[in-house]
Amino acid sequence: MHLQSVARLTRQCHGLPLVELPPPYLAPSLHFSLIRTPVQCSSFSSTAVVGGRGRDLNKTRGVSAIHRTGPRFKLGVSKYPLPKPVSPAALEKREATPDHGLWGFFPRDRSALSTPEYDVAHGRSWSIQELREKSWEDLHCLWWVCVKERNRIATSNLERQRLKAGYGEWEASERDRTIRVTQNGIKHVLRERWYAWEDAKRLYKNGYRPQDEENQE
Protein backbone atom coordinates (compact mmCIF):
# COMPACT_ATOMS: atom_id res chain seq x y z
CA MET A 1 0.00 0.00 0.00
CA HIS A 2 1.31 3.46 -0.86
CA LEU A 3 2.68 5.59 1.96
CA GLN A 4 0.31 8.50 1.24
CA SER A 5 -2.69 6.16 1.32
CA VAL A 6 -1.56 4.80 4.69
CA ALA A 7 -1.16 8.29 6.09
CA ARG A 8 -4.58 9.31 4.83
CA LEU A 9 -6.14 6.18 6.36
CA THR A 10 -4.53 6.99 9.69
CA ARG A 11 -5.85 10.52 9.71
CA GLN A 12 -9.36 9.31 8.84
CA CYS A 13 -9.35 6.69 11.62
CA HIS A 14 -8.04 9.26 14.20
CA GLY A 15 -5.35 6.96 15.56
CA LEU A 16 -7.02 3.56 15.65
CA PRO A 17 -5.49 0.89 17.88
CA LEU A 18 -3.54 -1.99 16.34
CA VAL A 19 -6.53 -4.36 16.42
CA GLU A 20 -8.54 -2.07 14.17
CA LEU A 21 -5.74 -1.52 11.61
CA PRO A 22 -5.51 -3.49 8.38
CA PRO A 23 -3.38 -6.66 8.40
CA PRO A 24 0.41 -6.10 8.32
CA TYR A 25 0.78 -7.69 4.88
CA LEU A 26 -1.61 -5.04 3.46
CA ALA A 27 -0.20 -2.00 5.25
CA PRO A 28 3.20 -2.85 6.80
CA SER A 29 4.33 0.76 6.93
CA LEU A 30 1.33 1.70 9.06
CA HIS A 31 2.19 -0.92 11.68
CA PHE A 32 5.91 -0.10 11.68
CA SER A 33 5.28 3.59 12.10
CA LEU A 34 3.30 2.88 15.26
CA ILE A 35 5.70 0.51 16.97
CA ARG A 36 9.04 1.81 15.70
CA THR A 37 11.27 3.61 18.17
CA PRO A 38 13.02 6.76 17.00
CA VAL A 39 16.67 6.17 16.05
CA GLN A 40 19.35 8.44 14.73
CA CYS A 41 19.74 7.97 10.96
CA SER A 42 22.49 10.45 10.15
CA SER A 43 26.09 9.41 10.72
CA PHE A 44 28.07 11.41 13.21
CA SER A 45 31.79 11.43 13.80
CA SER A 46 34.14 13.92 15.37
CA THR A 47 37.23 12.66 13.51
CA ALA A 48 38.85 14.86 10.88
CA VAL A 49 39.00 12.09 8.25
CA VAL A 50 35.23 11.59 8.11
CA GLY A 51 34.56 15.27 8.50
CA GLY A 52 36.69 16.18 5.49
CA ARG A 53 34.29 15.25 2.73
CA GLY A 54 36.16 17.06 -0.01
CA ARG A 55 39.40 15.13 0.39
CA ASP A 56 40.01 11.82 -1.37
CA LEU A 57 42.70 9.65 0.21
CA ASN A 58 42.85 7.23 -2.70
CA LYS A 59 45.44 8.60 -5.12
CA THR A 60 44.55 6.15 -7.88
CA ARG A 61 40.80 6.65 -7.78
CA GLY A 62 39.39 7.24 -11.24
CA VAL A 63 42.42 5.84 -13.04
CA SER A 64 41.38 3.18 -15.54
CA ALA A 65 43.51 1.62 -18.25
CA ILE A 66 40.43 0.14 -19.91
CA HIS A 67 38.44 3.38 -20.17
CA ARG A 68 41.59 5.50 -20.63
CA THR A 69 40.71 7.85 -17.82
CA GLY A 70 43.33 9.78 -15.94
CA PRO A 71 43.55 10.69 -12.28
CA ARG A 72 41.16 13.15 -10.69
CA PHE A 73 43.95 15.52 -9.70
CA LYS A 74 46.57 17.04 -11.94
CA LEU A 75 49.95 15.40 -11.50
CA GLY A 76 53.28 16.88 -12.47
CA VAL A 77 55.48 14.76 -14.74
CA SER A 78 58.77 16.28 -13.71
CA LYS A 79 60.13 19.32 -11.97
CA TYR A 80 61.99 20.19 -15.16
CA PRO A 81 60.15 21.35 -18.30
CA LEU A 82 59.85 18.88 -21.15
CA PRO A 83 62.26 19.46 -24.06
CA LYS A 84 60.81 20.76 -27.28
CA PRO A 85 61.44 18.76 -30.47
CA VAL A 86 63.93 20.25 -32.90
CA SER A 87 63.02 20.68 -36.53
CA PRO A 88 64.89 18.28 -38.85
CA ALA A 89 65.93 21.24 -41.00
CA ALA A 90 67.78 22.78 -38.04
CA LEU A 91 69.83 19.64 -37.35
CA GLU A 92 73.32 19.21 -38.67
CA LYS A 93 73.73 16.84 -41.55
CA ARG A 94 75.62 13.74 -40.47
CA GLU A 95 77.76 11.82 -42.89
CA ALA A 96 77.65 8.04 -42.84
CA THR A 97 80.69 6.20 -41.56
CA PRO A 98 82.28 4.50 -44.56
CA ASP A 99 83.83 1.63 -42.59
CA HIS A 100 80.96 1.01 -40.15
CA GLY A 101 80.56 -2.60 -39.06
CA LEU A 102 76.85 -2.71 -39.95
CA TRP A 103 77.72 -2.41 -43.64
CA GLY A 104 78.73 -6.05 -43.40
CA PHE A 105 75.03 -6.98 -43.36
CA PHE A 106 74.58 -5.54 -46.86
CA PRO A 107 76.12 -6.35 -50.25
CA ARG A 108 79.32 -4.68 -51.34
CA ASP A 109 77.44 -1.98 -53.25
CA ARG A 110 75.59 -1.21 -49.96
CA SER A 111 72.16 -1.74 -51.46
CA ALA A 112 69.28 -2.92 -49.30
CA LEU A 113 68.46 -5.85 -51.58
CA SER A 114 71.04 -8.12 -53.19
CA THR A 115 70.57 -9.05 -56.83
CA PRO A 116 70.35 -12.66 -58.06
CA GLU A 117 73.58 -12.12 -60.01
CA TYR A 118 75.38 -11.24 -56.79
CA ASP A 119 74.00 -14.21 -54.84
CA VAL A 120 74.74 -16.75 -57.55
CA ALA A 121 78.37 -15.60 -57.92
CA HIS A 122 79.95 -17.85 -55.29
CA GLY A 123 82.25 -20.83 -55.20
CA ARG A 124 81.89 -24.25 -53.67
CA SER A 125 81.88 -25.10 -50.00
CA TRP A 126 85.05 -26.05 -48.12
CA SER A 127 85.75 -29.76 -47.96
CA ILE A 128 86.55 -31.57 -44.72
CA GLN A 129 90.04 -32.46 -45.91
CA GLU A 130 90.81 -28.81 -46.58
CA LEU A 131 89.47 -27.79 -43.20
CA ARG A 132 91.59 -30.39 -41.39
CA GLU A 133 94.72 -28.56 -42.53
CA LYS A 134 93.58 -25.26 -41.03
CA SER A 135 94.63 -23.99 -37.62
CA TRP A 136 92.34 -23.08 -34.77
CA GLU A 137 92.56 -19.39 -35.63
CA ASP A 138 91.73 -20.02 -39.29
CA LEU A 139 88.70 -22.14 -38.43
CA HIS A 140 87.51 -19.50 -35.97
CA CYS A 141 87.80 -16.72 -38.57
CA LEU A 142 86.16 -18.83 -41.28
CA TRP A 143 83.25 -19.69 -39.00
CA TRP A 144 82.46 -16.03 -38.29
CA VAL A 145 82.81 -15.14 -41.96
CA CYS A 146 80.10 -17.73 -42.65
CA VAL A 147 77.92 -16.33 -39.86
CA LYS A 148 78.29 -12.80 -41.20
CA GLU A 149 77.40 -13.89 -44.73
CA ARG A 150 74.33 -15.78 -43.54
CA ASN A 151 73.19 -12.69 -41.64
CA ARG A 152 73.61 -10.68 -44.83
CA ILE A 153 71.47 -13.20 -46.74
CA ALA A 154 68.80 -13.10 -44.02
CA THR A 155 68.71 -9.29 -44.23
CA SER A 156 68.21 -9.43 -48.00
CA ASN A 157 65.50 -12.08 -47.64
CA LEU A 158 63.62 -9.94 -45.12
CA GLU A 159 63.81 -6.91 -47.41
CA ARG A 160 62.74 -9.05 -50.36
CA GLN A 161 59.67 -10.24 -48.46
CA ARG A 162 58.80 -6.69 -47.43
CA LEU A 163 59.01 -5.38 -50.99
CA LYS A 164 57.37 -8.53 -52.44
CA ALA A 165 60.02 -8.56 -55.15
CA GLY A 166 59.23 -12.06 -56.36
CA TYR A 167 62.78 -12.93 -57.42
CA GLY A 168 66.09 -13.98 -55.89
CA GLU A 169 64.78 -16.58 -53.43
CA TRP A 170 66.41 -19.56 -55.15
CA GLU A 171 69.80 -17.88 -55.58
CA ALA A 172 69.86 -16.76 -51.95
CA SER A 173 68.84 -20.21 -50.68
CA GLU A 174 71.57 -21.92 -52.73
CA ARG A 175 74.20 -19.54 -51.40
CA ASP A 176 72.98 -20.13 -47.86
CA ARG A 177 73.06 -23.91 -48.37
CA THR A 178 76.69 -23.74 -49.52
CA ILE A 179 77.65 -21.77 -46.42
CA ARG A 180 75.85 -24.23 -44.15
CA VAL A 181 77.83 -27.10 -45.69
CA THR A 182 81.05 -25.28 -44.79
CA GLN A 183 79.84 -24.72 -41.23
CA ASN A 184 78.97 -28.38 -40.86
CA GLY A 185 82.46 -29.26 -42.06
CA ILE A 186 84.03 -26.95 -39.48
CA LYS A 187 82.01 -28.59 -36.70
CA HIS A 188 83.01 -32.03 -37.98
CA VAL A 189 86.72 -31.15 -37.89
CA LEU A 190 86.44 -29.66 -34.41
CA ARG A 191 84.63 -32.78 -33.24
CA GLU A 192 87.44 -34.97 -34.59
CA ARG A 193 90.03 -32.88 -32.78
CA TRP A 194 88.03 -33.11 -29.57
CA TYR A 195 87.88 -36.91 -29.76
CA ALA A 196 91.60 -37.07 -30.56
CA TRP A 197 92.39 -34.93 -27.53
CA GLU A 198 90.17 -37.12 -25.31
CA ASP A 199 91.92 -40.27 -26.55
CA ALA A 200 95.37 -38.75 -26.00
CA LYS A 201 94.45 -37.67 -22.47
CA ARG A 202 93.11 -41.13 -21.63
CA LEU A 203 96.29 -42.82 -22.96
CA TYR A 204 98.46 -40.48 -20.94
CA LYS A 205 96.53 -41.29 -17.76
CA ASN A 206 97.03 -45.00 -18.45
CA GLY A 207 100.81 -44.54 -18.54
CA TYR A 208 101.43 -44.41 -22.28
CA ARG A 209 104.49 -42.34 -23.28
CA PRO A 210 105.53 -42.01 -26.93
CA GLN A 211 109.21 -41.47 -26.02
CA ASP A 212 109.35 -44.93 -24.42
CA GLU A 213 108.65 -46.58 -27.77
CA GLU A 214 111.31 -44.46 -29.43
CA ASN A 215 113.90 -45.54 -26.84
CA GLN A 216 113.04 -49.20 -27.36
CA GLU A 217 113.65 -48.88 -31.10
UniProtKB/Swiss-Prot annotation:
Major location category of this protein: mitochondrion
GO biological process terms on file: mitochondrial translation
UniProt keyword annotation of Ribonucleoprotein present: yes
Record keywords: Mitochondrion, Ribonucleoprotein, Ribosomal protein, Transit peptide
Repeat as UniProt keyword: no
Molecular-function GO terms, alphabetical: structural constituent of ribosome
Residues spanning the signal sequence: none
GO cellular component: mitochondrial large ribosomal subunit
Source organism superkingdom: Eukaryota
Compartments in which it is found: Mitochondrion
Record text on subunit structure and interactions: Component of the mitochondrial large ribosomal subunit. Mature mitochondrial ribosomes consist of a small (37S) and a large (54S) subunit. The 37S subunit contains at least 33 different proteins and 1 molecule of RNA (15S). The 54S subunit contains at least 45 different proteins and 1 molecule of RNA (21S).
Family, similarity comment: Belongs to the universal ribosomal protein uL29 family.
Protein name in the entry: Large ribosomal subunit protein uL29m
Species of the source: Neosartorya fischeri (strain ATCC 1020 / DSM 3700 / CBS 544.65 / FGSC A1164 / JCM 1740 / NRRL 181 / WB 181) (Aspergillus fischerianus)
Gene it is expressed from: mrpl4
